[in-house]
C-alpha cells in the first residue's frame, strides 16, 4: 500500500501558493485494509475515508467511465491493481495531476511541472470534455492564478467551447454553479472567471443576464470604457482590490443588469436602468439560490446606486428616505456594504479607477448622524405618536446641518 499527496496541495506547494486542504490517494489497498487501520468511510459514490487522527481525506485509487449526462454521470472502478497513473489521468488539468510521496518525491506522468513553470492551464486528456463542471473549475483556476501569469491553453479552451456546445452545462445544478461561482468571486481577480466563461460561450448559458451587457454602449463622457459588460467586470475588479465581502462582490456584479434592457432608441443613455434591473437581479438570484440577505443587498444596490452617487446633492428628506429604505437603524452593516458597492461602480471606469469618491465618506457620516439620534434624546414633553414624527424631523434636520457643513467645506476649498 502506497500513499500519495495529490491534487491542489502538490500544485500549490510547487507554486509557493498557500494551501490548507490536503487530499491523499491510496494505491494497492482495499477498503477493508483502511477500515482495519481505523479509517472512517465517508464517500457515497466511491471509497473515500477520513484519517483516524488528522481527519484528512484518503481516496482509493480509481478509474472512471462516463455513463450519463452531467458531472454525476460516471461509473467509478476501484481496485488494488489501479495504478497511480490510472488515477491521475482522470483529473482535469496537468497541474492537478501530480502526486508526492511521503519522502517528497514528485510523480508527474502528464507534464504538470512543465505547465506549472510555463504558467499554462492544460487538460490532461480528451476525457476532459466528459465533465461539464470543468468549464467552471478551469475558469476559476484562471481567476485564482492570474496573479502568476497563468493562461488557458488554446486547445483546452476549444474543449471548453465544445462542452458548451453539447448542452451539458444545463445539467449542472444551481447549487453546483453557485458553489463554483461564489468561490471564484472571492478570488483577487474574479472578473477573469466571467471573462473566461464568455470566451467559451458558457456565460450566455449560465449567466445570460450578465452576458447580455456586453456590446451595450454607454455615454463615453461618463464611461470611457463604453461597453456595459466591460464596466461590470472593471467594477468587480475594484471590489476584489478592496477585498470586499462576497455579498458586496455579487451586488457589484449585478448592479447594472438593467442596462441590457434599455430600449435601443435611447442608447447610449440608460434612463431608469435601475428599475429595469430589479427583475433580472431577482431572477438570477433565485435561479442560483443565493442567500436571501445577499439578494436583498444586490437589489438595493441595483435600485439605489445612482442615489448614492448623488448623495451630496440630495435634499435632506430624500437622503433620509434613502437611508430608511436601506434599513439604516437596524442594519448599519448593510448600508456600509451598499456604500462600498457603489464606490466600486464609480471606480469601475476606464481611467477613473483611482478617482476620489467623497460620497462614501458623506454617506458614512450621514449614517452615523441619524443613528446617533434616539428617542431618549427628545424633550420630555414629546409623547405618544409624536415621538416617531419628531425623531424623523430631528434626523432630517441633522442631515441638513451635515449637508451645510459639506457645502461650506467645498466652498472654502
Swiss-Prot record:
Gene3D superfamilies the record matches: Beta Polymerase, domain 2 (3.30.460.10), cca-adding enzyme, domain 2 (1.10.3090.10)
InterPro entries per the UniProt record, alphabetical: CCA_bact, HD_domain, NT_sf, PolA_pol_head_dom, PolyA_RNA-bd, tRNA_CCA-adding_enzyme
The keyword Hydrolase belongs to this UniProt entry's keyword annotation: yes
Keyword hit for Iron: no
One GO term (biological process): tRNA 3'-terminal CCA addition
Domain of life, source organism: Bacteria
Co-factor: note: Magnesium is required for nucleotidyltransferase activity.
Keywords assigned: ATP-binding, Hydrolase, Magnesium, Metal-binding, Multifunctional enzyme, Nickel, Nucleotide-binding, Nucleotidyltransferase, RNA repair, RNA-binding, Transferase, tRNA processing
EC number(s) given by UniProt: 2.7.7.72, 3.1.3.-, 3.1.4.-
Cofactor or coenzyme needed: Mg(2+); Ni(2+)
An MF annotation (GO) of this entry: CCA tRNA nucleotidyltransferase activity
Domain spans labelled HD: 228-329
Residues given in the record as ATP binding sites: 8, 11, 91, 137, 140
Pfam families for this protein: PolyA_pol, PolyA_pol_RNAbd
Reactions catalysed according to its record: a tRNA precursor + 2 CTP + ATP = a tRNA with a 3' CCA end + 3 diphosphate; a tRNA with a 3' CCA end + 2 CTP + ATP = a tRNA with a 3' CCACCA end + 3 diphosphate
Sites where the protein binds CTP: 8, 11, 91, 137, 140
Binding of Mg(2+), residues: 21, 23
HAMAP family: CCA_bact_type1 (MF_01261), CCA_bact_type2 (MF_01262)
Classification via PANTHER family: MULTIFUNCTIONAL CCA PROTEIN (PTHR47545:SF1)
Task of the protein: Catalyzes the addition and repair of the essential 3'-terminal CCA sequence in tRNAs without using a nucleic acid template. Adds these three nucleotides in the order of C, C, and A to the tRNA nucleotide-73, using CTP and ATP as substrates and producing inorganic pyrophosphate. tRNA 3'-terminal CCA addition is required both for tRNA processing and repair. Also involved in tRNA surveillance by mediating tandem CCA addition to generate a CCACCA at the 3' terminus of unstable tRNAs. While stable tRNAs receive only 3'-terminal CCA, unstable tRNAs are marked with CCACCA and rapidly degraded.
Assembly with partners or alone: Monomer. Can also form homodimers and oligomers.
Entry comment, domain topic: Comprises two domains: an N-terminal domain containing the nucleotidyltransferase activity and a C-terminal HD domain associated with both phosphodiesterase and phosphatase activities.
Record-stated family: Belongs to the tRNA nucleotidyltransferase/poly(A) polymerase family. Bacterial CCA-adding enzyme type 1 subfamily.
Additional observations: A single active site specifically recognizes both ATP and CTP and is responsible for their addition.
Protein name: Multifunctional CCA protein
Gene source species: Acinetobacter baylyi (strain ATCC 33305 / BD413 / ADP1)
